[in-house]
Amino acid sequence: MNDLAQYAPGPASGAQVRKDGEKWTLILVRELRHPPAKVWEALTDPLHLREWAPFDANGSLATVGATVKLTWVGTANVSETRVTRADPPRVLEFHDIRWELEPLAGGTRLTLWHSIDRRFIAWGAAGWHIAFDVLDRLLSGTPIARIAGRDGMRFEGWQRLVTEYAKQFGADPPNWAPKPAQKS
């Protein structure tokens, strides 16, 4: 891993929400400079997910009907999910997450739909924003360490993104701030 010290997330962009009561759907779009097949592998292979995603999977997400245990980084909670749609390399769907991959000249438009409790929508947007940055660097061959969970919340730039996304979405950010990282 390299370059983490030089990484800083850009401004909040490419996101919107669909509001439905307490459950809101985050829609985040990112254009990546990599072909859909390469992006698909990063979305479905547990070894790749471990490098960039905010969760670990104990198996491949590439097959409809596959039952996979997901563990969100920094939590002890394990949830079992079933892949409900897998059309490589176009659409992947499981639990409350849907990915669409659209080929572009020289890359892929990746769209994420993630249903999130409205109180945490800005957190989700900030977390996925950073995860997409880490994914892009991984696919480019210049990986940096995964920035997720409580470590992600302590990462410089995360709180700024939460504030920017909350303002964009017309949502109040949660009034909880992560504790500073422990010094060794």
Locate each region found by the language model.
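Short beta-strand segments
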Residues: 77-81, 97, 108
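Solvent-exposed residues in well-ordered beta-strands and their adjoining turns
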Residues: 31-35, 71, 102, 113-117
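Short, surface-exposed beta-strand-loop junctions and turns on beta-sheet-rich folds
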Residues: 47, 76, 98-102, 116-118
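Terminal "cap-and-tail" regions of soluble proteins that handle hydrophobic small molecules
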Residues: 1-21, 105-184
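Short beta-edge strand/loop motif at the mouth of beta-sheet-based domains
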Residues: 19-28, 34, 38, 45-89, ...
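A structural signal for short hydrophobic beta-strand segments in well-ordered beta-sheet cores
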Residues: 17, 83, 99-101
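Short, solvent-exposed secondary-structure boundary/capping segments
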Residues: 90-96
